[in-house]
Amino acid sequence: MKLRGCGTALVTPFKQDGSVDFAAQRALVEWQIESGIDFLVPCGTTGETPTLSHDEWLKVIAQTVEVNHGRVPIVAGATSNNTAEAVEKAKEVAAIKGVDAILTASPYYNKPTQEGQYLHFKAIAEAVDKPLVLYNVPGRTAANIETATLLRLAKIPNIIAVKEASGSLPQIMDVCAQKPEDFTVLSGDDALTLPILAVGGVGLVSVASNQIPKELSEMVRAALNNDWATARKLHNHFLALMNANFLESNPGPVKAVLAMMGRIEENYRLPMVPMRPENRAKLEKIAAEAGVLKNATVAQ
């Protein structure tokens, strides 16, 4: 399996009473696929997975698979900072027919050494027969997967890719220059996608594609086809929105815009909260200028 193109790190819609809005989630998945997205990533950070119960986590993944019906690859999130638990979660996801790969992040909070991270990911890989996509996001985990460690992990047959959100272009360039041919680098940062694609990345796991799946899929596709003029035009047009999605902690802003678009209700689970009014107003202005609010619909 080789992931390529733009994949959406899906939000998880909630109702006002705090329950998962499965009807809105179903509609979002269908809209994403109809818009030309290349793959889908349910239950990552953007999906507020830490606030989902175990049962809800599995149900969100299962419904994504059901709605997808084999049309695009599904890369389901399964992460824990307890290796034994991470292994069990990966096994559960691997057992869901229609899940194509598993996204798993570095152990967070307990700050393992590089050897600890290597053995953690190795244990997960050896426990399942599904491809693994590693998620390097040290800004959240406090545990960077260094290049030497990642290159060791890339030798494990079913570790096929990394979602790179370290924010360090020098590190990402080193990985791209030294990685095996069959190991894939995916951008985990919307705003850095074009530089990452230019040095050897082949895709993006996106937050902003929740809002603009068609446009970001076209941007990545254009870059991969060496149509850099089109890719730059789309990047420059949506760069302000990409950055505004992080005016506050993700997924606050992306869910706010989706609510403005009429695609979900704007509800969160603590500790996530609605945006401050001044930031929400700034975000709405940027979203309107980017043109994403012009076709707002009625929320499902």
UniProtKB/Swiss-Prot annotation:
Gene3D superfamilies membership: Aldolase class I
Catalytic function, reaction form: L-aspartate 4-semialdehyde + pyruvate = (2S,4S)-4-hydroxy-2,3,4,5-tetrahydrodipicolinate + H2O + H(+)
UniProt keyword annotations, A-Z: Amino-acid biosynthesis, Cytoplasm, Diaminopimelate biosynthesis, Lyase, Lysine biosynthesis, Schiff base
Active-site residues annotated for this sequence: Y135, K163
Biological pathway: Amino-acid biosynthesis; L-lysine biosynthesis via DAP pathway; (S)-tetrahydrodipicolinate from L-aspartate: step 3/4
Enzyme Commission code: 4.3.3.7
Principal subcellular localisation of the protein: cytoplasm
Annotated site location: Part of a proton relay during catalysis: T45, Y109
Binding site for pyruvate: T46, V205
Disulfide bonds: none
Entries under PANTHER family matching the protein: 4-HYDROXY-2-OXOGLUTARATE ALDOLASE, MITOCHONDRIAL, DIHYDRODIPICOLINATE SYNTHASE
Family: Belongs to the DapA family.
Task performed by this protein: Catalyzes the condensation of (S)-aspartate-beta-semialdehyde [(S)-ASA] and pyruvate to 4-hydroxy-tetrahydrodipicolinate (HTPA).
Protein name: 4-hydroxy-tetrahydrodipicolinate synthase
Gene: dapA
